[in-house]
């Protein structure tokens, strides 16, 4: 069964790199890149993804609180969508801890650090 993935990543270049990597590493997936955080919930409503991967930053519109609001909207329309947060673990310890706590509380299904290998990255997405 084809896995649908929506990416909401700050940098277009980074998003397209992730898209290519996922298409190479996963056998059967469709990747959609959300062009703006404000459009992510609508993209998810339209495409009904299995996985939503959102990058979290210390500034708007990629802040943790804003990402959780998008998560809430997506879960209303696509209850079975798995939410994964992507964070740069080298730059913001407090933000990284918020993401970890969200996983502990069951608000997200997984998190990924920017420092993980491509194989691990793809494996986590494939496993949820």
Stretches found by the model and what they are:
Residues 12-34:
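Two-component/phosphorelay signaling modules centered on CheY-like receiver
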Residues 2-4, 81:
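Nucleotide donor/acceptor-binding cores
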Residues 52-77, 87-98:
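Conserved phosphotransfer microenvironments
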Residues 35-51, 59-61:
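Acidic, metal-coordinating helix/loop segments flanking the phosphotransfer/catalytic sites
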Residues 1-2, 10-19, 48-57, 94-108:
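Conserved N-terminal glycine/acidic-rich loop preference
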Residues 9-10, 87-127:
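Output/docking surface of receiver
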Residues 45-47, 73-80:
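Conserved phosphotransfer cores of two-component systems
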Residues 31, 83-84:
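Hydrophobic/aromatic residues located in beta-strands of well-ordered beta-sheets
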